[in-house]
């Protein structure tokens, strides 16, 4: 009788559906850096890698993650890729903030910059921006070459002071107003002539923004996060 019961139990166990294991969020005593790469850069941190690495080195006990999104222009099309990035970023921020007490840092380049600022403030035909209560967990945000750059904002940085990006936010609009509520923890770097953030013709200006301003961005982040 006992042997039969044991065999039945084993058979039932073997045929049961596998149990999904809960994925636990890793928390850091330093900061949790989320890096969002630019268009058509290989999966991972892309051009933001140097900034992310410097932050990790400067703030002990920190960790990082590369935003998992298409970062594409044509397949899928740019707007869909940005939307995918927004949803992924909001999910990462909410998951970390719900599970951990540490601070979050956001770093984005080009399309990745667009993803970050749209996640914060919304955009045309984009998902609802993240609940501002979650941004209380974000200590610093630095973006480079953001196509939605709008000149004349207090958080603007770089050499461009007169031109807007190719997807600039509307002056006086709700999106730009919401983005300005995060001005104390945000820097948006854009240089004169940049094809995307300054509607210029200098492709090298776009690619040189992180090499030019990366150290300044790290100093800004460290000043707000330690």
Residue ranges of each PLM-predicted region?
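Fungal secretory targeting signals
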Residues: 1-25, 226
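Active-site catalytic motif of lipid deacylating hydrolases and related acyltransferases
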Residues: 24-102, 187-211, 223
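Extracellular/periplasmic catalytic domains that process cell-envelope and extracellular macromolecules
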Residues: 26-28, 98-99, 115, 132-136, ...
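Short, solvent-exposed loop/turn and secondary-structure capping segments
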Residues: 45-46, 118-119, 152-156
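Gly/Ala-rich beta-loop-alpha elbow adjacent to hydrolase catalytic centers
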Residues: 106-116
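Conserved hydrolase catalytic core segment
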Residues: 122-134
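Active-site nucleophile loop of the alpha/beta-hydrolase fold
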Residues: 138-149
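C-terminal catalytic-base region of ester-bond hydrolases, centering on the histidine
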Residues: 153-226
